[in-house]
Design a protein with these regions (language model features):
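Beta-propeller blade termini and top-face loops
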Residues: 22-611
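Bacterial N-terminal signal peptides
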Residues: 5-15
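Sec/Tat signal peptide C-region and signal peptidase I cleavage site
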Residues: 17-21
Length: 611
């Protein structure tokens, strides 16, 4: 969108304020820079937290039982050769993108593997990729295998008998119509690619399953969907399930076959049973969606389950995997990790993994007790069919922003996506006296919020979360108190239906001129002078509040309104460090405002021609 540069503009304005106060004559015409020699002695070190972030891609080796891979959505590709006891990142400094969308190891030669970049679980913080990468030495070195314009991928599937033949599911650009999407095939190990399945410029490929008994039989799904800052849409005429019996040269659509649900169709996950090639499972997003099963290779279908447990938040999940040894066993990945042993009719087994929100599963084709699963905490391994799992301890956490506490030595604090807030020591652990004896501590709030440390009491933190949640946490006592601006829960509502529009990660900042004053922002700027006991609104609506950006999110099948879609908000807030009563505010829909009288009046100072 043309106004997305507004945050950078506000930060630039706030940074320039001290210069104006020190030198009233002129402002510099060139941006500031720092001599690299001043930074040459600085070295980075990992201070934690020692807990993983989201993963949506896993794979393993059939012939090497202790070798597995998982891809982080922001931390690259990781490998273990000791069954998950230890992990090593394989891509740092070797590839130019750390957002792993899919990964596969060649069954015929486990030294050969491919991974795709860019994610397709269309969250508000979805990240683009930079093509496909290939390794011939178990991940020690990498070469680009092209398709950089596709941007976002999900699956990569390799012919189990031919490491040079592979397919990738290219979803494409998630925010704009593009022709760079569909199923791509390479017959020469990624040197060249052909687009073999394509519907239109709004529908990308999202899943692929190859029949291990007959690798020329392939199933693939296309998904019409988009994500923009103010919402997302899943479903449309471009979505569909397809089958090829000649290695991807020709395709027939299965979505219209008897037993399939009527449109509109959304996201589809598919898996063919390695036990019986005629048995295929499809998880279909539709009004009458659910689990659909065929025993004739897709000619006819029957719905075996319409449970919401297997199809909630379809855009974020809709993954499944057939068991390689048991025909009637199928796993579904959703909020819970579910298993059916009756051909997809019921899912009574909830497999306990270290973290919730499940996205991918690889099962060893020669041992159905050995598997690796991907969830919002990373990759985790089981060698007993899911009875127990390895820990998810590696530095792949996605942190929204950092806050330095006023302790000495100080703590480094942040909110971790898909987890909680977390503070870790900057120096060592000797001075840490954490309640409960943990390695770090949460300061309340949630996964997406700002954290503000009280400038007068280093033990007091204010931490936010989506939906306008705001907590006050006292480190010395361990007590948490809700100090929300409004006692409201907007989950499930459109932005147009809620009184205050708090962004997924809304600003919470102290006034550097008045240490008793704390600010927060929705479409309005709010302040408290009594530690959140009461709040006062000090601005009008400082956004464009365009109705086109405030409507329902999710599309015509499954609404999804969890707070990340809340738009037209004050996204950046910067009280001046030098001038009392001066506050700058930037909205996510492209406006800059300033007050010089503590909020009594505001001026729109949006630069003309802002890109």
């Amino acid at each position: 969108m043309q106004y997305l540069a507004i945050v950078a503009a506000v930060v630039g304005i706030a940074a320039a304020a001290p210069v104006r106060a020190q030198d009233e004559q002129t402002l510099p015409t060139e941006p500031y820079s720092v001599d690299d020699s001043y930074l040459s002695g600085l070295k980075w070190r990992n201070v934690g937290p020692d807990r993983g972030g989201r993963s949506i891609a896993v794979s393993g080796s059939a012939s090497r039982p202790n070798e597995y891979y998982f891809g982080a959505t922001g931390g690259g590709l990781w490998k273990t050769i000791d069954g998950g006891t230890s992990w090593k990142v394989m891509t740092d400094g070797k590839v130019d993108n750390g957002v792993v969308g899919g990964v596969a190891v060649c069954e015929a030669n486990p030294d050969i593997l491919y991974f795709t970049t860019g994610e397709t679980e269309l969250r508000g913080n979805v990240q683009p990729g930079h093509g496909v990468f290939k390794s011939l030495d178990s991940g020690k070195t990498w070469t680009s295998a092209g398709l950089k314009k596709v941007r976002n991928f999900s699956r990569v599937r390799i012919d189990p008998k031919d490491c040079n033949t592979l397919f990738v599911a290219g979803f494409g650009h998630y925010g704009a119509p593009r022709e760079d999407r569909g199923v791509y095939k390479s017959s020469d190990g990624g040197a060249n690619w052909r687009k073999v399945l394509y519907r239109d410029e709004r529908s990308g490929a999202v899943d692929i399953s190859i029949d291990p008994k007959d690798p020329k039989t392939i199933y693939a799904s296309l998904w019409e969907a988009w994500r923009r800052p103010w919402g997302m849409s899943s479903g449309g005429p471009g979505s569909g399930l397809f089958k090829s019996v000649d290695g991807g040269e020709h395709w027939s659509e299965l979505t219209r076959n008897p037993g399939m649900p009527a449109g509109p169709i959304g996201k589809i996950g598919v898996t063919v049973s390695p036990v019986d090639s005629a048995r295929v499972y499809a998880l279909v997003e539709a009004k009458d969606g659910g689990m659909f099963v065929t025993d004739d290779g897709g000619a006819t279908w029957r719905r075996t389950s319409d449970s919401r447990d297997i199809r909630q938040r379809a855009f974020y999940y809709t993954r499944l995997q057939a068991d390689p040894k048991v025909k009637d066993r199928v796993y579904v990945l959703n909020v819970n990790f579910l298993r059916s042993d009756d051909g997809g009719k019921t899912f009574p087994t909830k497999i306990k993994v270290p973290h919730g929100d499940n996205h991918d599963l690889w099962i060893a084709p020669n041992d159905n007790q050995r598997m690796i699963e991907a969830n919002d905490g990373g990759g985790t391994i089981s060698v007993n069919g899911g009875k127990s799992w390895t820990k998810e301890s590696y530095p792949t956490a996605q942190i929204y922003r950092l806050t330095i506490s006023n302790h000495y030595p100080y703590f480094v604090c942040g909110a971790q996506q898909d987890n909680s807030s977390i503070c870790v020591p900057s120096k060592d652990w000797k001075h840490v006296n954490v309640l409960g004896g943990q390695y770090g501590f949460a300061v309340a709030g949630g996964e997406s919020g700002y954290i503000a440390n009280d400038p007068q009491d280093p033990n007091v933190f204010y931490a936010g979360s989506y939906g306008g949640a705001l907590d006050r946490f006292d480190y010395s006592t361990g007590q948490t108190r809700s100090v929300n601006v409004l006692p409201d829960n907007p989950m499930g509502y459109s932005a147009s239906d809620i009184g205050e529009r708090f962004q997924w990660t809304y600003p919470i900042v102290f006034d550097p001129q008045d240490k008793n004053r704390l600010y927060a922002s929705s479409q309005h700027v709010w302040q408290t002078l009594d530690q959140g006991q009461s709040w006062q609104r000090i601005s009008p609506d400082l956004t464009r509040h365009d109705p086109a950006t405030l409507g329902p999110s999710g599309g015509g099948i499954t609404l999804d309104q969890t707070g990340v879609e809340t738009y037209s908000t004050v996204f950046a807030l910067a009280p001046s460090r030098l001038e009392p009563n001066v506050i700058w505010a930037g909205s996510d829909d492209g406006l800059v405002h300033v007050t010089r009288d503590d909020g009594r009046s505001w001026q729109n100072v949006t630069p003309a021609g802002l890109p």
